[in-house]
């Protein structure tokens, strides 16, 4: 079978497309559908482990995750378990093809069979007659209480990219802050500052932060933010374990960011502390 040459610098040649290739159906996030269903392009593997494959597609990160992984907001989700993931052997720097509704791996085509819509935090609605109405709403945050661009940039610079791994601890905390701020309609300056510094962190983490700036996150995280913003302790207690179980410390760092944003929504310019610990549970509210 004829192999397709790829550009110099990539460690492998492109996959062979043939009649005996395995086909695995997947559900593509509405946030990534245009990339996966667009023209066929070369993509680069950013990272690979059993539950997930992270691809750079035309400068955007497209995660591909198994059924037992956290369903990231921009992900292509498969029904197979991580033990049967079709990307074994792929490593950072390898080349694959993405487009025309397919993710073409060596020996396997992942087919975008359907589209799924990721979870998004609910905007706060102020209802004085509702016990579950948030105690804080964007209409109650005076313009002088909102962070200036300079304040937001200083705070974001203190957190972004801080810590090891594909999603550093500082980024996870920032994601929690962004989600709460988006729910309250006050994310503008912080979101702009984060997007201006996305090159300061990993490509995978940058994609997660970009989604969080628009209120998107894994369903487990959105459930916790919605419960915390609504001031519903029972719902928080139900949602918290699933978030704390995310990654080695990512869930705990997200909780730190969520709690910090809830406590200091009127002074977001002071959210500059790097998470000191990810080994304990931070109360929310």
Regions found by a protein language model. Give the residues of each.
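Short, Lys/Arg-enriched N-terminal segments with co-localized hydrophobic residues
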Residues: 1-3
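Phosphate/adenylate-binding glycine loop and adjacent helical scaffold
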Residues: 5-134, 140-154, 165-170, 183, ...
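Intrinsically disordered, low-complexity proline-rich regions
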Residues: 133-142, 176, 277-282
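A short glycine/serine-rich beta->alpha loop
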Residues: 160-168, 211, 241-249
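Conserved phosphate/anionic-ligand binding catalytic regions in large, soluble enzymes, centered on
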Residues: 166-181, 250-262
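A translation/RNA-centric and nucleic-acid-associated enzymatic feature enriched
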Residues: 220-224
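Acidic, carboxylate-rich catalytic segments that either coordinate divalent cations
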Residues: 225-285
């Amino acid at each position: 079978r004829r192999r397709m040459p790829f550009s110099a610098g990539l460690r492998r040649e492109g996959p062979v497309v043939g009649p005996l290739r395995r086909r695995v159906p997947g559900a593509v996030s509405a946030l990534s559908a245009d990339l996966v269903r667009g023209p066929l392009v070369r993509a680069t593997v950013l990272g690979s482990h059993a539950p997930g494959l992270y691809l750079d597609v035309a400068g955007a990160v497209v995660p591909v995750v198994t059924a037992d992984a956290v369903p990231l907001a921009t992900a292509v989700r498969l029904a197979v378990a991580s033990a049967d993931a079709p990307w074994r052997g792929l490593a950072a720097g390898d080349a694959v093809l993405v487009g025309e509704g397919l993710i073409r791996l060596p020996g396997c085509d992942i087919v975008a069979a359907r589209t799924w819509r990721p979870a998004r935090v609910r905007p706060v609605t102020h209802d004085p007659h509702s016990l579950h109405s948030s105690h804080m709403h964007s209409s109650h945050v005076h313009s002088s209480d909102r962070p200036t661009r300079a304040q937001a940039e200083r705070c974001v610079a203190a957190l972004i990219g801080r810590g090891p791994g594909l999603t550093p601890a500082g980024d996870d905390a920032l994601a929690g802050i962004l989600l709460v701020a988006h729910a309250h309609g006050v994310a503008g300056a912080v979101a702009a500052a984060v997007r201006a510094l996305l090159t300061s962190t990993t490509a995978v983490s940058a994609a997660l932060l970009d989604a969080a700036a628009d209120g998107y996150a894994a369903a487990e995280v959105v459930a916790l933010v919605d419960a915390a913003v609504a001031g519903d302790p029972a719902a928080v207690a139900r949602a918290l374990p699933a978030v704390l179980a995310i990654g080695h410390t990512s869930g705990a760092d997200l909780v730190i960011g969520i709690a910090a944003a809830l406590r200091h929504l009127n002074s977001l310019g002071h959210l500059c502390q790097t998470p000191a610990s990810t080994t304990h549970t931070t109360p929310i509210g």
